[in-house]
């Protein structure tokens, strides 16, 4: 049996709107998601055992069944028990380059890579939609991470509508190491403060999805107008996260003042990103930001936008 190493890219939210409450307790969302070429490396090796083992050098990444990548492997074993019995377990090694607990879907993209890798090792021949359906059972971002690119994501985030790929741009990612934001807290706080603005009917949800799909940001992406893209990025969760996390608010303000195309918090944070027209512009902004924000645990990453999801190396 073959071993495989896969690249699992991070994601940013170019658009995140909370539309209303769903019967299942989740929020109805309309998002535009984008993969970024800052990637973890996931290696899967058959181990000849009847178990999955997970290894990672990062101290904040659990190496047990609480890890979403391990849960992805367990899901595959439950879905395909005969193949699991025949092929046996797999050792999963995660080389972590995406910041942890950062709003960049690091856990989700690792899980997506495990699904793709086990499909290859067990020679299942699953289609991309079949992999996305399995991924949706693991988390709201995981389906998107399988395919990547530039995608309108609705429902909990698992309903995917790919659009014209956004290419040629670079992104700065910035995060304080000591900061983390609880995603459940962010959404619950938004509900408490803004529930009176929620839409309630499926018809209203559909209408709002259509409005965003034909709206200014999606048009700017289709027309490849970088300045307009930066102007129309949006994240509802900033309304609750930024007031409670002044360092994130300050980071957003500083980066936004330094001349990129657009700056915003990704997902529930605390990572802030800036879209840039080139690597050189991104490097200049990071240099200037470091001079303004002198903090030993403030980390920056620069990477191009990518139109791919999980890739085999």
UniProtKB/Swiss-Prot annotation:
Gene Ontology biological-process entries: isopentenyl diphosphate biosynthetic process, methylerythritol 4-phosphate pathway; terpenoid biosynthetic process
Function: Catalyzes the phosphorylation of the position 2 hydroxy group of 4-diphosphocytidyl-2C-methyl-D-erythritol.
Matches recorded under Gene3D superfamilies: 3.30.230.10, GHMP kinase, C-terminal domain (3.30.70.890)
Protein name (record): 4-diphosphocytidyl-2-C-methyl-D-erythritol kinase
Enzyme class: transferase
Catalytic residue list: 11, 141
Keyword Transferase attributed: yes
Metabolic or biological pathway: Isoprenoid biosynthesis; isopentenyl diphosphate biosynthesis via DXP pathway; isopentenyl diphosphate from 1-deoxy-D-xylulose 5-phosphate: step 3/6
Keywords: ATP-binding, Isoprene biosynthesis, Kinase, Nucleotide-binding, Transferase
Residues where ATP binds: 99-109
UniProt source species: Microcystis aeruginosa (strain NIES-843 / IAM M-2473)
Pfam families: GHMP_kinases_C (PF08544), GHMP_kinases_N (PF00288)
InterPro entries recorded: GHMP_kinase_C_dom, GHMP_kinase_C_sf, GHMP_kinase_N_dom, IspE, Ribosomal_Su5_D2-typ_SF, Ribsml_uS5_D2-typ_fold_subgr
GO molecular function: 4-(cytidine 5'-diphospho)-2-C-methyl-D-erythritol kinase activity; ATP binding
Taxonomic lineage of the native organism: Bacteria, Bacillati, Cyanobacteriota, Cyanophyceae, Oscillatoriophycideae
Record family assignment: Belongs to the GHMP kinase family. IspE subfamily.
Record EC number: 2.7.1.148
Known catalytic reactions: 4-CDP-2-C-methyl-D-erythritol + ATP = 4-CDP-2-C-methyl-D-erythritol 2-phosphate + ADP + H(+)
